[in-house]
C-alpha cells in the first residue's frame, strides 16, 4: 500500500503544516470606526518590534483613550513619536485618515476595503499605494501591482511607506538561510518532486525519474491518485 501524498498530509492539518500563530505579535487593525468617526485620537509609539508572522515590523501604540493597538510601522517611525488617527489628523507619516481627506499624490498603506474593517490592502514590507484622484463617491488608488482600484472615501489608510523594504535585495546564497526563512512560518520546505520519489510515495515515483504514465488525472480520482494535471482540457505547448 502506498503512502499519503504531501497534499493529503497537509489537508489533515498536523502541526507540521500549521502556522505557528502563537509566536506572532497579534492582529494589526485600526481602532474601531465608532471611536474615530467624529474625533481624532492621539497616540504615542511605545515600542517597535519584529513580527515573525509578517514581512514588516509592527509598532505598539498607546492612545489617549487608554486603548493599545499594534500598527504596521512605516519608514521613519520613531519610538516616542506621536501619531494621530481620525478625520482631522495632520498629513504626516504614520497618521491615519479617511481617503477623502488625503491629497492626491500621497503614499499610503494598510487601506481598508470596507469602512471599519481595520485595513486589508498594502501591508507587506516596503510596499505603498498612491492616491491618484478623488471624486464625490470614490477615491482612485494605484496599488503596488499598478492596478487602479476605487475605494469608498470613508475607508481609512495610513500615510507613508511600509518599513522593511529591500529585504529581498540580499540573496539567500545558501540553503541554510532558506531553512530558517521557511521555519519562521513553519512552511513545509524543501518540497520534493514526485518523479524523484520512490514508487511507494507518489504515483509518478520510481521508474527512471519520469512519470511513466499520462500526467492528466480525472477530477473524480481518489485522493491518493489525484496528482498532475487535474481535469486538464489540454497539456503541452500551443501549436
Swiss-Prot record:
Gene Ontology cellular-component annotations: cytosolic large ribosomal subunit
Biological classification of the source: Archaea, Methanobacteriati, Methanobacteriota, Thermococci, Thermococcales
Protein known as: Large ribosomal subunit protein uL2
Comp. bias intervals (Basic residues): 222-239
GO molecular function ontology, one term from the record: rRNA binding
Free-text function comment from the UniProt entry: One of the primary rRNA binding proteins. Required for association of the 30S and 50S subunits to form the 70S ribosome, for tRNA binding and peptide bond formation. It has been suggested to have peptidyltransferase activity; this is somewhat controversial. Makes several contacts with the 16S rRNA in the 70S ribosome.
Gene name of the encoded protein: rpl2
Quaternary structure (record): Part of the 50S ribosomal subunit. Forms a bridge to the 30S subunit in the 70S ribosome.
Region (Disordered): 203-239
Family: Belongs to the universal ribosomal protein uL2 family.
Xref: Pfam families: Ribosomal_L2, Ribosomal_L2_C
NCBIfam families listed in its UniProt record: PRK09612.1
Protein's GO biological process: cytoplasmic translation
Protein keywords: Ribonucleoprotein, Ribosomal protein, RNA-binding, rRNA-binding
Amino acid at each position: 500500500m502506498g503512502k499519503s501524498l504531501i497534499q493529503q498530509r497537509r489537508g489533515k492539518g498536523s502541526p507540521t503544516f500549521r502556522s505557528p500563530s502563537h509566536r506572532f505579535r497579534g492582529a494589526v487593525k485600526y481602532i474601531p470606526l465608532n471611536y474615530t468617526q467624529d474625533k481624532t485620537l492621539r497616540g504615542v509609539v511605545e515600542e517597535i518590534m519584529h513580527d515573525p508572522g509578517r514581512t514588516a515590523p509592527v509598532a505598539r501604540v498607546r492612545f489617549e483613550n487608554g486603548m493599545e493597538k499594534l500598527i504596521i510601522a512605516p519608514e521613519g517611525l520613531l519610538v516616542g513619536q506621536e501619531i494621530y488617527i481620525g478625520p482631522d489628523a495632520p498629513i504626516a507619516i504614520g497618521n491615519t485618515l479617511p481617503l477623502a481627506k488625503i491629497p492626491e499624490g500621497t503614499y499610503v498603506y494598510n487601506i481598508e476595503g470596507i469602512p471599519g474593517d481595520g485595513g486589508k490592502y498594502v501591508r507587506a514590507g516596503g510596499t505603498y499605494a498612491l492616491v491618484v484622484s478623488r471624486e464625490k463617491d470614490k477615491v482612485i488608488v494605484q496599488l503596488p501591482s499598478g492596478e487602479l482600484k476605487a475605494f469608498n472615501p470613508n475607508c481609512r489608510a495610513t500615510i507613508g511607506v511600509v518599513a522593511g523594504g529591500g529585504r529581498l535585495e540580499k540573496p539567500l546564497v545558501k540553503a541554510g538561510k532558506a531553512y530558517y526563512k521557511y521555519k519562521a512560518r513553519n512552511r513545509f520546505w524543501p518540497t520534493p518532486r514526485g518523479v524523484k520519489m520512490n514508487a511507494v510515495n507518489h504515483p509518478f515515483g520510481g521508474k527512471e525519474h519520469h512519470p511513466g504514465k499520462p500526467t492528466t488525472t480525472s477530477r473524480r480520482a481518489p485522493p491518493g491518485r489525484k496528482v498532475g494535471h487535474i481535469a486538464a482540457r489540454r497539456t503541452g505547448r500551443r501549436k
